[in-house]
Swiss-Prot record:
Residues 519-534 have a biased composition (Polar residues). The keyword DNA damage does not apply. It is an enzyme of class 2 (transferase). A zinc finger (RING-type) spans 133-183, 292-322. CDD domains: BRcat_RBR_ANKIB1, Rcat_RBR_ARI7-like, RING-HC_ARI6-like. Zn(2+) 6 binds at residues 319, 322, 329, 339. This is Putative E3 ubiquitin-protein ligase ARI6. Its EC number is 2.3.2.31. Belongs to the RBR family. Ariadne subfamily. The active site is at residue 305. GO terms for molecular function: ubiquitin conjugating enzyme binding; ubiquitin protein ligase activity; zinc ion binding. SUPFAM superfamilies: RING/U-box. Zn(2+) 3 binds at residues 222, 227, 245, 247.
Amino acid sequence: MMDSDDDMLDAHDMDSVDYDFDSGGTDDDNDIDETDYVFGEADTDDAAIIAYHRSQINYVVLKEEDIRRHQKDDVGRVSVVLSITDVQASLLLLHYHWSVSKVNDEWFADEDRVRRTVGILEGPAPDGREFTCGICFESYPLEETISVSCGHPFCATCWTGYISTSINDGPGCLMLKCPYPCCPAAIGRDMIDNLCSKEDKERYYRYFLRSYVEVNREMKCCPAPGCEHAISFAAGTESNYDVSCLCSHSFCWNCSEEAHRPVDCDTVGKWILKNSTESENMNWILANSKPCPKCKRPIEKNHGCMHMTCTPPCKFEFCWLCLNAWTEHGESSGGYYACNRYEAAKKQGLYDEAERRREMAKNSLEKYTHYYKRWASNQVSRQKAMGDLQKMQSEKLRKLSDIQCTSESQLKFIAEAWLQIIECRRVLKWTYAYGYYVPDDHTKKQFFEYLQGEAESGLERLHECIENDIEVFEFGEGPSEEFNHFRTKLTDLTSITKTFFQNLVKALENGLADVDSHAASSKPANCKPSSNTKDGGKGKKEALTMAGSAET
């Protein structure tokens, strides 16, 4: 483990190749080291949210106005080319899943068929002075009725109720048709604008906006609750699908779960399913209980005596060891705290299989509990770090700036450290899901646990520095000469931790591919040397180089 700041600084200075855990990697890396942090406020007024962007990103965060602009551009292009209104162009694009080329191809191939299919009709002009509404059956003058392209008249009140009900029912309102039976005429945005309440309009245009994103293969809505942003992703040869929204939520473009590097999407799916099913409950029952010999109900032994009594209505009394009736037990069977029958049967191998299954279930449960607790603990720590970051920005930054007589922009290194902690907590969290599926008897397991321990040690050092060392400057009476030393120390720790974690991610994503070849010539004990000896430092270097040589 990293026992001193000097260890981390020495590690950072070591020569390395590619994802040697002590280097910054090559200049063309697109991983978590290539990150520029941008500070900004979210759309909500009650919280300041930090969002970071990669310097070489393969995605763009789109706000609502950006999506509307894209929509408006597509609608305008169709409207101009086909010489139709924007409302009609919107109906066509909705029908053809916002594909401008598909709309143009279908329209010029058979305009009449497209009009009938979409519901853009050219109905007869009304020729009467008074009409009967087809919904409420009241008579109205012509000027008080409304119709779409089909010409079927309905009163404004019935139109409003009909459209409002459809909007409240969900996104199907985007394809709403005339209420006249079997009429295919489409209802466009102009009707919503003229007849609906402000609340209904907002809901309708929210559906309208999302429809543009949902059918676009290069866009996805941010899955964070209440977020209206979308991500435009440019797929390439990189396997990094992690994206970060302006709302501070990071997720995987490929599976839409939260960002989970270095774990692949299939493993994440298995882990989440395991956390949400009853499988571990069954493992606990199997490991800590035995079935009643009569009713087969699982029974947990919670007292020292071997005399067990099943709950009503069964009430069967039996021996916990051999599972035979208690009436058959006594001094001849070994007394109340032992069972000669069980010992004899065990020697004959009669109970080996049941005990083996119970022991396997117990070990499986203990393993899962070990990894799940640490997975969940890092998530809690990450959430706390996010809260500390927001508190620092909203409350402490200005105060620290005043005390140290420096501008807030010069304190950016503090926010960068917190952001690195948040990112490292996320990575560390998912290393426990990764570790759960690494075979226990594999050489990679030992090396993985060594690297994970190094990562935890380095992160704790950074966390301790920003939480504890900064306090003396937050509550000082004036500028301190030691503040520049603190700045240098925190900046160095942030850089070293960032480098270590970005190389850890790369190594795990590569499956620690080179470990097997090194295992043949290196003892597993070398993976975790003592940091108190000179030879131990050499062993650490060799272990770190082991991971770095995979891409040599």
